[in-house]
Regions:
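Sec-dependent signal peptide recognition
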Residues: 1-7
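C-terminal motif of bacterial Sec signal peptides marking the signal peptidase cleavage site
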Residues: 11-13
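Catalytic histidine site
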Residues: 17-72, 163, 169-175, 179-180
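Short amphipathic beta-strand and strand-loop transition segments with alternating hydrophobic
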Residues: 40-41, 76-80, 129-133
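Conserved active-site neighborhood of the chymotrypsin/trypsin-like protease fold
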Residues: 46-126
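Flexible, gly/ser-rich surface segments that form the specificity/activation loops bordering the active-site cleft
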Residues: 96-154, 169-179
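Pro/Ala/Gly-rich low-complexity, hydrophilic intrinsically disordered segments
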Residues: 180, 187-190
Length: 190
């Protein structure tokens, strides 16, 4: 009896969700000249999307975004989801994809005292969640030990160290030039 050897392949689908990561990543955000805000891309169940704050503008279909410190670009597609001050959009790009997308898990469980970080233009601004949404205020608040220039940072991703995923979108801060308190909206994909 002859043994038949068959090759065995393990294939990973492009639609596999990106798993959480152990360390807060260094991430280069996306920007559009003339807009005072930030976009980022993330993986949700194997599909890639852009997130931004509604109040910053620049989310018209066909708008070209540039990755900070790079020639990489993305073209804004259609809106697929929105929340109070948060928009989720499709996009196309030849150079921005799965490899550097931020991981996301549905229904993020953000808690008081969680270590989080604002990711913007390759910088990691570390903070701690100090307040959860109350009453009509839908924001979670993070406090940093060092001040940061918040002007133009609306739309930046807020990343949870404990969960290893992006959990929210920065929308407000207590100062444009020397903030130490930032408010973010939880990213809740349908």
């Amino acid at each position: 009896m002859k043994a038949l050897l068959l090759p065995f392949f393990v294939l990973t689908s492009c639609s596999d969700p990106k798993p959480p990561v152990a360390e807060i990543p260094n991430y280069q955000t996306l920007h559009h000249e003339g807009l005072n805000g930030t976009f980022f891309h993330f993986d949700h169940e194997g599909d890639l999307y852009l997130a931004c704050s509604i109040h910053q503008g620049g989310h018209a279909k066909g708008t070209t975004l540039n990755r900070h410190d790079s020639k990489d670009t993305a073209s804004v597609g259609k809106q697929i989801h929105h929340q109070k001050d948060l928009r989720i959009l499709t996009f196309t790009s030849d150079s921005i994809g799965q490899a550097d997308a931020l991981p996301y898990s549905p229904d993020p469980d953000v808690r008081k005292d969680d270590e989080v970080a604002i990711l913007n233009r390759g910088e990691i601004i570390r903070g701690t969640v100090v307040r959860l949404p109350e009453g009509n205020d839908h924001h979670y608040y993070l406090q940093t030990s060092k001040t940061f220039p918040a002007n133009g940072m609306s739309g930046s991703p807020v990343f949870s160290k404990r969960l290893g995923t992006v959990v929210g979108v920065l929308q407000t801060a207590n100062s444009k030039t020397a903030a130490n308190l930032g408010g973010f909206e939880l990213l809740e994909m349908p």
